[in-house]
């Protein structure tokens, strides 16, 4: 069980709401603009300390209020941990177990939530940094010291770039290059290992959603394939000096999704690409659940967006089969929902920011 109780205050059009979700499927019904997505946004805030819809807190806080508050209990019945996020227009407070935290890292580790929504397709269509963020979030949950490793690499990269620009007289480019190669190689190896572990789950999800077996994940470390990072830095040194910054490295890392050996985004329809993205995110959730049973939460917004009824039912059936605590929003026609979920789901109705338990 991940989320035992949720209390929301002043998140967009939700003035005040409380709910006790079920441990499996939680279905949220309501018209467009009713507050369904805002409810998912509140859960995401409780998991990551930030919104997935806007980086500007003023757009998330109810228009006439100074701040928003989302709090809840995470864990198992009788042993829940109190967590909370208070977000003002220029400040944020995160609390875990009644104590303030310096960052959201403890919250993220305690309550991992995976989000699937219509814009998730940008994960495959968008820039590499979004795919790096997905990888790094996943590695963070399986490697205890990964966040510190990323910070070490970032600091060392800044130092090497300063030498390249001539802003650090007396510093040795060779020394910083050696340090950078050490941290960068470790990051690339951890990302590659993580992607290897996702592949099995991903293949199962792709088969269930698209019926394909010719989809593969290919890692790109951020430098020439087959080279060590140290060799790539040495070869790139003249270019780096001219540019004033370090060109190769995990800061340029990426991964590709190929279908029949071709980039998925150049081969599949938008609906198929969306299903492929959902398969990737479900695979990430499945891997994390295998490592940390009972702690993962799945958020699925607007399941009907750009999917026909058959694919909606496939996706909902797959979400149900994961056994994860899941929150799924619906608007409009929902004829196939009952046939897929039976009587196992907990149902909520959202109307103008108010939430009530239904059937």
Curated annotation (Swiss-Prot):
GO terms for molecular function: ATP binding; ATP hydrolysis activity; single-stranded DNA binding. ATP binds at residues 30-37. The keyword ATP-binding applies. SUPFAM superfamilies: P-loop containing nucleoside triphosphate hydrolases. It is found in: Cytoplasm. InterPro entries: AAA+_ATPase, DNA-binding_RecF, P-loop_NTPase, RecF/RecN/SMC_N, RecF_2. SMART domains: AAA. Keywords: ATP-binding, Cytoplasm, DNA damage, DNA repair, DNA replication, DNA-binding, Nucleotide-binding, SOS response. GO terms for biological process: DNA replication; DNA synthesis involved in DNA repair; double-strand break repair; SOS response. The keyword Transcription does not apply. Belongs to the RecF family. The RecF protein is involved in DNA metabolism; it is required for DNA replication and normal SOS inducibility. RecF binds preferentially to single-stranded, linear DNA. It also seems to bind ATP. HAMAP family: RecF (MF_00365). NCBIfam families: recf. This is DNA replication and repair protein RecF. It comes from Methylococcus capsulatus (strain ATCC 33009 / NCIMB 11132 / Bath). The gene is recF.
């Amino acid at each position: 069980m991940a989320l035992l109780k949720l209390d929301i205050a002043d998140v967009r059009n939700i003035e005040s709401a409380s709910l006790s979700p079920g441990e499996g499927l939680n279905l949220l019904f309501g018209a467009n603009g009713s507050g369904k997505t805002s409810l998912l946004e509140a859960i995401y805030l409780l998991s990551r300390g930030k919104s997935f819809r806007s980086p500007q807190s003023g757009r998330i806080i109810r228009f006439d209020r100074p701040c928003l508050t989302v709090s809840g209990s995470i864990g198992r019945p009788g042993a829940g941990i109190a967590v909370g996020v208070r977000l003002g227009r220029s400040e944020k407070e995160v609390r875990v177990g009644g104590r303030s935290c310096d960052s959201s890292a403890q919250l993220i580790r305690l309550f991992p939530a995976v989000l699937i929504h219509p814009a998730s397709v940008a994960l495959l269509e968008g820039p590499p940094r979004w795919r790096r963020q997905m990888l790094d979030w996943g590695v963070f949950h399986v490697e205890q010291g990964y966040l510190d490793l990323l910070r070490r690499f970032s600091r060392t990269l800044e130092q090497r770039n300063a030498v390249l620009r001539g802003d650090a007289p007396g510093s040795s480019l060779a020394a910083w290059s050696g340090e950078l190669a050490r941290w960068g190689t470790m990051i690339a190896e951890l990302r590659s290992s993580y992607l290897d572990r996702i592949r099995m789950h991903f293949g199962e999800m792709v088969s269930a959603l698209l019926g394909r077996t010719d989809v593969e994940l290919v890692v790109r470390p951020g430098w020439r394939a087959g080279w060590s990072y140290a060799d790539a830095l040495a070869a790139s040194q003249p270019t780096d000096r001219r540019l004033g910054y370090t060109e190769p490295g995990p800061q340029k890392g990426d991964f590709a999704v190929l279908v029949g050996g071709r980039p998925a985004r150049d081969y599949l329809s938008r609906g198929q690409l969306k299903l492929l993205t959902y398969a990737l995110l479900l695979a990430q959730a499945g891997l994390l659940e295998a490592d940390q049973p009972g702690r993962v939460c799945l958020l699925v917004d607007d399941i009907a967006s750009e999917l026909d009824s058959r694919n909606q039912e496939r996706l909902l059936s797959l979400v149900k089969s994961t056994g994860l605590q899941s929150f799924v929003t619906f608007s409009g026609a929902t004829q196939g929902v009952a046939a897929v979920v039976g009587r196992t789901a907990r149902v909520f109705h959202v109307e103008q920011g108010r939430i009530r338990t239904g059937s």
